[in-house]
Structure formats: structure tokens, C-alpha cells
């Protein structure tokens, strides 16, 4: 999901250079919120249903052909997008695909991020795909903070977002530390909002809501567009390398980002976010994974425990200007 959010930066730069260019984004309907105001078209993709199989990708390609697409930019580079672009290429449509820099990232990990330059940012890699198709434009400038509606009503005081979750254990803040971080933030700020998915994440958020009167669990209360609107009204967001960090980058909200097994130098740091918000442990064993999806070699995820709740609270204070 964070990959989709990052695409909005690249498309903003492309549309600023080519305002009359017709761009159609093939993605899940829920992600349309990331592209508000960019004058784009959409093709809804149902990867759990009609577009799940090879046949489904060919059907999606046929739909794209009927739309009259002149070129395909594959910024995802996974099996389904390869099938999609190949189907159109076989019908004579020019295609370009992302170069993910796998060797560059492996070298960064092998050297522990020491003495090696950071990998190219994913947003720039997205821009490069469009450049392969002949479009000439600059890398996007960071997003600007703009007024957006507040789904939580009138704001008074300082509001903080907290999102300790990720799809990977190596990028998820430990639960016990998360509870302590919420306590410190709730004691210090007027309102704290817990961003989460469902299941155990939602239960953690509801637990924190029950424990502190100024904490609000967001799951089930707002959709993706409402959550993005809320983030735009927050003073700071605490997030892992996750969707919420990238959503904050879209609306220029300050972020304190916590990094475990992976590293901001691998190209996935929130585009345009202030690097002063980065929290990570200097350990010989990290980074050890590009995506944070490999098990910890020690079994204890010590890199995450090294970033304490007190460190998070103090960094938030710095980011909000206390």
C-alpha cells in the first residue's frame, strides 16, 4: 500500500510537466484517495476476484486496450503487472518497467549502510519509468501542507498520530513498548489517534482508547480518504516504515519514523519527510533486510527494542517544536 501512496508524488510531477496528458491508474478503488486533485483516470483492479489469475490480467489488459492506452508504465514490477504489460506489449503497445535496484540494495545491506551511498528513492524510480517512455520532467518537490477537512471535528491543542504496525514483524513496534509510547504521548498531548488495521491491531487500539480518555482508535471510524484528511490535520505522526508514513508524506505532516530490520537509505523513506524524524539503532546486524520480511537472526528483534518509548516521545517533542 505504501508503494501506491508513493506513486502519487511521481504522478504529481508528471502532471505538472504535462497537464494535458491523460493518465489512467490501474489500482484498487480504496487507493484513489492518494491521488486526489491530480486529474487522473482509474481502472479498478480486483486481485482477489476477477483479476486474480493470468486470465484476469489478460482481461484487464483488454479493458485497457479498449480505453485507448498509448503506453504502459509498470511501476510495480511483480508477476501480475508483468502479465498485464506483456499482454499489451504483444498487442503493440509500448511498455516501460521499473528498475528496482536489487544489486544496489543488496550492497547497501552487505555493508550495513556504512560507506555506501543511499539507494535511489522509489519515487525517483517511478519517475524513471515514465522517462523511459519519453517524458521529460524533474523529480517531484516535496508535498506542501494544505488545508483539508478534519473528520474528527474542531481541533484544539496538539494532536499526534501513532501507528506502530506494519505488514512485517521486523517493522512492527513491540506491543509492550507501544503501550508505553501511547502512555507518554497521551500524558503530553491533547489527543492521540491510533492508526491500525483490523484484528489484533484494532484490539490494541481499542485497548489504548479504553485506557486513556484522549486516545482515539481510528479503525472503523474513517475510510482511507478520511484518514488522510485527519493526518493532514495532525501536528506529528509516529509511524514505522509503513503506509501511514507515506500518507503523511503526501500531506506534508511531520513524521517520527521508527526503523527496525530495514533502513531509510534503501529508498523507502517517506518522500520529502524531514530526516530529523528518523529513529533507528546503530547495530552491526542492521539493516539485514530490504523489506523487513526476514526473521531476526537472533530471534529477539533487538533493533526495535533499542528504540525506546522515551526516545519516541522526545523526538515527537522536537518535531512539534517544544
Annotate each language-model stretch with its function.
Residues 1-322:
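Catalytic machinery of carbohydrate-active enzymes
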